[in-house]
């Protein structure tokens, strides 16, 4: 998957300080990098991204574009998405970096389900194949990443499937890709157990699995 940003981004340069959930999200990201679900491919293109809702709003913090190869992120490696328009394929973000190419898909999740507090998009061919075999909730084939179509598809899946309950989404058109959605529980991130390795940390997330 290319990390090329396809949307029009209006970036407002602004310092990003440590936000609520920053440490927990980074810890989960480190574990996913160890598993190879986030990183850089043979062509030097980064893959995988994480985000966390900004309080009870539809705004969110998301890893910046091209950060897959960075071992440990600091607050300035994140962008705060404050507005978006699916039809115009546009978003506004704050911070020193451009928001991840998957930002509009994350926005579709937060807009569709208020209980989701974090979103993780990771790449793992084994998990992707397992989800494909069990016919997990999936986006339509042929829908490209970073487009209004994928955002609309995700919103529709919340309406017509049990994704709200399962909190995992597979992307058939992107081998190894999946998404995990998390809930906010008592103002804290819950615990999520990675299905492949059983590695645990304090972040609960919706996983969106796509292949590399």
Where are these regions (language model features)?
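Glycine-rich flexible loops
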Residues: 1-212
